[in-house]
Amino acid sequence: IPLSLLQRLIRQYKIKINNKKSKANSKLNSGDVIYIYYNFQFQEKQNFKIKISKDFQNKLRKRIIFEHNDFIIINKLNGYSVQKGSKVSISLKDYYESILDTTLYIVHRLDKDTSGLMIFAKNRMAASSISKLFLLNKIHKYYLATTHKSFIKNSGMLENVNNEKKLLKLFYRKIKSFDNNYLYIIKLLTGRKHQIRLQFYLNDNPIIGDRKFTNDKKEVLLLRSIAIH
């Protein structure tokens, strides 16, 4: 069973422990019963086609930065969820599977409101290999973020912990200031959900347009994935 499917079923509350909602980090105890509400079927070939306007298809194709037999790199659109969830019926992954007519595998994530470079694997072997490279820090991700405030230091390391007591760590460097705004380049050293937005918020320097940790609903989130190598 693909890991992405299990994660989606958890988000949709279709995997339960003792018939109660579960989370990805839920712990099992002796005697627990796992319920999976999903009709598993073997399919020779999946029909990926969904209705997409020609203009939107062209827009998506133009955002394919690089295509290989084993993976693609896209310039992700702002405002689109990468995968399905309880409130997302069609994801960016679904759109690309439809126009490419192939199964795609998620190997890392970008938040819905974050734009920029993202990799999709085209087969399970590639997905496993690329995911392992991320875990071993053999692939590095860089982001640009814009804020209204400035850190005291022009560059440095931010270290925090999230609500799950997991370490958050990133390196930042200010590269430009303009109109009382500040542009930072960021390198992730750990991979946690909403990490950049959370760390900037915890250090009293929220990213412009961040609706997750602030009430900034007037502006687009100025956070972008700019490099993967």
Set out the residue ranges of the language-model regions.
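RNA pseudouridine synthases
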Residues: I1-H229
